[in-house]
From Swiss-Prot:
Keywords noted in UniProt: Carbohydrate metabolism, Cytoplasm, Hydrolase, Magnesium, Metal-binding
Superkingdom of this protein's organism: Bacteria
Gene from which this protein is expressed: fbp
GO cellular component, one term: cytosol
Protein name per the record: Fructose-1,6-bisphosphatase class 1
Compartments, as annotated in UniProt: Cytoplasm
Residues that hold Mg(2+) 2 according to the record: D114, D117, E281
A GO biological process held by the record: fructose metabolic process
Pathway(s) it belongs to: Carbohydrate biosynthesis; gluconeogenesis
Organism (species): Nitrosomonas europaea (strain ATCC 19718 / CIP 103999 / KCTC 2705 / NBRC 14298)
Subunit structure of this chain's protein: Homotetramer.
Amino acid sequence: MHTGTTLTQFIIEEQRHIAGASGDFTALLNDIVTAIKTISNAVNKGALIGVMGALDTENVQGETQKKLDVITNEIMIRNNEWAGHLSGMASEEMDDVYSIPSPYPLGKYLLVFDPLDGSSNVDLNISVGTIFSILRSPVPSRAASMEDFLQPGVKQVCAGYALYGSSTMLVLTTGHGVNGFTLDRDIGEFVLTHPNMRIPADTREFAINASNQRFWEAPVQRYVAECLAGSTGPRGRDFNMRWVASMVAEVHRILTRGGIFMYPRDTKDPSKPGRLRLMYEANPMSFIVEQAGGLSTTGYERILDVVPQDLHQRVPVILGSKNEVEVVLEYHNA
């Protein structure tokens, strides 16, 4: 029997401190949470209900879609299109903005999401997740255009992710710190288990895909080489290297015990100087990391200050423990 604060209770308490709050945002967040519970169920059942494996289709990124990519995208849409809180949605799995169907009322928020981050891992039973970002619509109750979504990350109202692992967790921020909730399946509710999450300023862990080492720029080459040199090198201490190929899993580890995550600019594909998508990966995760006391940068500018030029724009990402990110920034500025 749980004795903690449920997510619903937590959000309502937060709402009471906001003058003029109408409950619209709370209702939207409840719809997102319902979608996340449904996705968690689909991911957990996996092969039992025949949803594992790949399709013969690609998304706008040119990536082969997993069955669960399509299923989870549909779950997010169907749970959030009908209630009148949104004027539009955008997803990693859709080329263009999703317009709210005409029978449904239009609202004052925009929802951007990656329905199943790390889906390449899903057949291997490695942790995957959902990432989402909520923005205000520039013109409430009007069908959203592409331009309406192209807002810098500093304008996010809320950002969060769900982690589908040994337990299902929801981590979110509304700009007043970061809190983590764990799904109690006995009562069907998320319960506050990780209040006021903070990233340690120092760390001895870094996460990067070392197979791309030959394509990195000099500042990242230098930083990683110094970490690998350990206690006999210029940093004077040993580091551990991690890589899960799931941004949600990487960021969750950093929130829990510190670390630095890097998917830096490289020359592997000149058309893609960055790999991660700004709107529905880098921005929401950067909002969370900064609210937890960490830093997030492209190596050249703060990610939350980047003005998007395209819905599926890619950027380099370096985020995590403050002091380590500052070392990488120092090398970029040298």
